[in-house]
Amino acid sequence: MDSSKVYFTDFRTPAYGDSVLKKLQKLIKRAGIAEMDLDGKFVAIKMHFGEHGNISFLRPNWARAVVDVVKELGGKPFLTDCNTMYPGYRKNAIEHLYCAWENGFTPLAVGCPVIIGDGLKGTDDVEVPVVGGEFVQKAKIGRAIMDADVIISLTHFKGHETTGFGGTIKNIGMGSGSRAGKKEQHSSGKATIIADLCRGCRKCRKECANNGLVFDEQSRKMTVNRDNCVGCGRCLGACNFDAIRFQNDGAVSDLNCKMAEYTKAVLDGRPSFHISLIVDVSPNCDCHQENDAPIIPDVGMLCSFDPLALDQACVDLCLKQTPIENSQLGDHMRAIGFIDRHDHFCNNNPESEYLSCLEHAEKIGLGSRRYELVKG
């Protein structure tokens, strides 16, 4: 596959010059965002609003800079993300919106609506065929994201405890999956009922098409018929009390490959453009209710029409940086018995790996790992 262009600029701004937000706008224009036909189109800007308590996510100002360019080109932008499969402040649309607003993503601040992609309970999804999929035949994608005419991803590039790093493919693939879609990527297992949390309301049973959930008259709790449960994850969104769990038992390589296939399902057949900011590179996901200190210095802003080339370029730039000594990565590198894997992300989270994601993404035609870095 031919190489793709990835555009890059750093965060330096001279006194009395353009702001760094203007610098981002100039970068995405130079990369060719204006070549996309956005006039009158619904444009989904896929990003992460940050978990409650976390402050390493991208500031709303970055989103506003992109929103203003989309509007200038005649588009109708909205910010979007889908609900999480685990307990927290983003597992349903009401709490998710409150969390986004608390973190500054209000319509007044960002200049457009914020729409939770998979609806109130995370069950409003569309099954999208994965062309060439080896792990997923039909991806479960939030309906609002699939209804959009154009996809723009805005990604905080950072470390991740499972996938090594969180980049464009994770933002789109995992982030656009409904609660059931996220479960499919994380696990091949069956539902488990946490009895102490179950209220016996039976709402979950209405969502199960396979008689996998049974009400136990003696305990007045729901139970799982493991012979019937197919692990679809639909029951996750039905429970308001976090009583249903799925163990994250999928191999990391399988998870990575599924993320790539979910990303392909989202992007196939639609115009898309992708932006990544290597800033506040925290060691773990922005899904945490806390964030540790950055593991490397800030690097810059990148964008491309190719999501895979963009992730590869971000990785390569990060690996050239000197680790910050007072960080999780620094701690690991000083630990007794440390084994150097010659990779910041693998040294940061030794149980993680990411090459399987990049390799599989290229195999299924998501993009190219070969790129030309255009600096400016």
Predicted segments, located by residue:
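Extended, low-polarity segments enriched in aliphatic/aromatic residues
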Residues: D2-N54, L58-W62, V69, L73-D81, ...
